[in-house]
UniProtKB/Swiss-Prot annotation:
GO terms for cellular component: nucleosome; nucleus. Belongs to the histone H4 family. The modification N6-acetyllysine is found at K6, K13, K17. The keyword Transmembrane helix does not apply. It comes from the Eukaryota. Core component of nucleosome. Nucleosomes wrap and compact DNA into chromatin, limiting DNA accessibility to the cellular machineries which require DNA as a template. Histones thereby play a central role in transcription regulation, DNA repair, DNA replication and chromosomal stability. DNA accessibility is regulated via a complex set of post-translational modifications of histones, also called histone code, and nucleosome remodeling. GO terms for molecular function: DNA binding. This is Histone H4. The keyword DNA-binding applies. It comes from Sepia officinalis.
Length: 18
């Protein structure tokens, strides 16, 4: 929910991925 503009391209969250 916090890493949306970081690595959340098509994941929605991405914060945990990037």
């Amino acid at each position: 929910m916090s890493g949306r503009g970081k690595g959340g391209k098509g994941l929605g969250k991405g914060g945990a991925k990037r």
